[in-house]
Swiss-Prot record:
Belongs to the UbiA prenyltransferase family. Protoheme IX farnesyltransferase subfamily. Interacts with CtaA. It comes from Cereibacter sphaeroides (strain KD131 / KCTC 12085). The chain crosses the membrane at residues 21-43, 48-70, 95-115, 118-138, 147-167, 174-194, 220-240, 243-263, 289-309. The keyword Transmembrane applies. Pathway: Porphyrin-containing compound metabolism; heme O biosynthesis; heme O from protoheme: step 1/1. This is Protoheme IX farnesyltransferase. GO terms for biological process: heme O biosynthetic process. It catalyses: heme b + (2E,6E)-farnesyl diphosphate + H2O = Fe(II)-heme o + diphosphate. Converts heme B (protoheme IX) to heme O by substitution of the vinyl group on carbon 2 of heme B porphyrin ring with a hydroxyethyl farnesyl side group. One of its GO terms (molecular function) is protoheme IX farnesyltransferase activity. The keyword Transmembrane applies. InterPro entries: Protohaem_IX_farnesylTrfase, UbiA_prenyltransferase, UbiA_prenylTrfase_CS, UbiA_sf. Its EC number is 2.5.1.141.
């Protein structure tokens, strides 16, 4: 029997490719923080409304991912980290990604408004617009402060979850927004330290590309120094408590140790161990955010038993 290999035929998009188009890893963080915002709000929400609200917030996050992948197809194709995504790899056509992103955006916003309230829907619509237009189409390609300002897009989900429950904004929801907003720069700059060539090849003006790794290391430290007291201060809001305080103190102590280590390293050290410290800091920063929000959720879960909060 002759083994015939056919090449040059594009792969047909499958279910998994369309799921990947929605950036499920990013969506998981959005869903979790939105869920925490919803569950810790000081009101009782019907389980069906809560489930529906989270579903359409997730759909809105997926829509943002699809729109971002449509717009960034040219630079995603160049970057090693992103070239295998459905659009740059040619599995999903850019026009198809755009259509899916727009359709899901409309469905998510309208249905969230009908199922919960107009304020939450308006906040979701603004978040999609901010991520797809303000960040993806403008900031990402024009300024090294792209992830500082653009980080607001990823910080809105807990505010949307809170708004689903309460119909408004509070000090607590603003704190959750601020926590993610201040976490975003050191998280992504630590990634940029060991992925500099990817951003440079694609022409993305990340801080490592425009100002170099030395300046970026200093920025990681400065933003970590700003983030740590903010995170600890959350213990003294209506969603904080002793468990959150202990968690925040431990995590932010570790954060500052890691940030100082990054700041003190020179390029010879980093290249010698293939950016081991920077990669470790990046991975830790993911756990950092999940554990902070997990502690917030735990405080709320313990309150009915007289154990959560102060």
């Amino acid at each position: 029997m002759t083994d015939i290999r056919i090449t040059g035929i594009p792969k047909e998009a499958g279910f998994g490719d369309y799921v990947a188009l929605l950036k499920p890893r990013v969506m998981s963080l959005v869903v979790f923080t939105a869920l925490v915002g919803l569950l810790v709000a000081p009101v009782t929400v019907h389980p069906m409304i809560a489930l529906t609200g989270i579903l359409f917030i997730a759909l809105g996050a997926g829509a943002s991912g699809a729109l971002n992948m449509w717009w960034d197809e040219d630079i995603d194709r160049v970057m090693k980290r992103t070239r295998n995504r459905p659009v740059p790899s040619g599995i999903v056509a850019p026009g198809e990604a755009l259509g899916i992103g727009l359709a899901l955006s409309g469905i998510a916003v309208v249905m969230l408004g009908l199922a919960t309230n107009l304020f939450a829907a308006g906040l979701l619509a603004f978040t999609i617009f901010f991520y797809a237009v303000v960040y993806s189409m403008w900031l990402k390609r024009t300024t090294p402060q792209n992830i500082v300002i653009g980080g607001a897009a990823g910080a809105f989900p807990p505010m949307i979850g809170w708004a689903v429950a309460t119909g408004g904004v509070s000090v607590e929801s603003l704190f959750m927004f601020a926590l993610i907003f201040m976490w975003t720069p050191p998280h992504f700059w630590s990634l940029a330290l060991f992925m500099k060539s990817d951003y440079s090849d694609a022409g993305v003006p990340m801080l490592t590309v425009t100002h170099g790794r030395r300046v970026t290391r200093a920025h990681v430290l400065v933003y970590s120094l700003l983030l740590a007291p903010l995170a600890v201060a959350g213990a003294f809001t209506g969603i904080g408590g002793p468990l959150y305080l202990a968690t925040a103190l431990a995590l932010n102590g570790w954060l500052l140790v890691g940030a100082v280590r990054i700041w003190r390293r020179d390029e010879a050290q980093a290249e010698a161990d293939r950016y081991r410290v920077e990669k470790g800091f990046f991975r830790f920063s993911l756990y950092y955010l999940f554990l902070h929000f997990g502690a917030i959720l735990a405080e709320a879960a313990l309150k009915p038993y007289g154990l959560g909060g102060w």
